[in-house]
Amino acid sequence: MKVKNSLRSLKQRHRDCRVVRRKGRVYVINKTQRRFKARQG
């Protein structure tokens, strides 16, 4: 999982990427290509 300051470029890496909020943190998840996970921090 990548940790980045800004998720703007990471959410455009794949068309299935979704931005979700969990426990006060912002994540990019991808159900089809799981290698595109990222967290803002």
UniProtKB/Swiss-Prot annotation:
<dbReference type="GO" id="GO:1990904">
    <property type="term" value="C:ribonucleoprotein complex"/>
</dbReference>
<dbReference type="InterPro" id="IPR000473">
    <property type="entry name" value="Ribosomal_bL36"/>
</dbReference>
<dbReference type="GO" id="GO:0003735">
    <property type="term" value="F:structural constituent of ribosome"/>
</dbReference>
<protein>
    <recommendedName>
        <fullName>Large ribosomal subunit protein bL36</fullName>
    </recommendedName>
</protein>
<comment type="similarity">
    <text>Belongs to the bacterial ribosomal protein bL36 family.</text>
</comment>
<dbReference type="Pfam" id="PF00444">
    <property type="entry name" value="Ribosomal_L36"/>
</dbReference>
<dbReference type="InterPro" id="IPR047621">
    <property type="entry name" value="Ribosomal_L36_bact"/>
</dbReference>
<dbReference type="GO" id="GO:0006412">
    <property type="term" value="P:translation"/>
</dbReference>
<dbReference type="InterPro" id="IPR035977">
    <property type="entry name" value="Ribosomal_bL36_sp"/>
</dbReference>
<dbReference type="GO" id="GO:0005840">
    <property type="term" value="C:ribosome"/>
</dbReference>
<keyword id="KW-0689">Ribosomal protein</keyword>
<keyword id="KW-0687">Ribonucleoprotein</keyword>
